[in-house]
Amino acid sequence: MNQDISICVLTENEMGWTEPFELDKVQILDNYYLSAQKSDIAFLKKMDTARLLAGFRTTAGIDTKGVRPYGGWEDSLLGGHCVGHYLTALAQAVKVTGDKELKEKSQTLIAGLEECQKKLGTGFLFGA
């Protein structure tokens, strides 16, 4: 059996090296990408910080008040893993948009993680 495969070999950029830039210096003008950004922000706003913190709180011995973690990875031995990705997404979205609700979510999440870290007393965080 034969199969054709295409390979793309990247060569050095004709413009030379690119320079780093701040996210808030980028302006999205294309409607497709603006729509994608709005969808991403709406998704970030739907995430429940209490559910994201539930595994960390359980591990630290802090009452979750009946709140359960999200399913999938968050309800397994990888629990808490997604929180780092979520914090990165929040930080980037706040940098780009200045959205106060997302900034508040990030502050709530960080405060919750700090509470768990202090309760454990080891400096360690574990969300599973």
Which positions does each model-derived feature cover?
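Glycan-recognition and catalytic cores of secretory/periplasmic carbohydrate-active enzymes
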Residues: 1-128
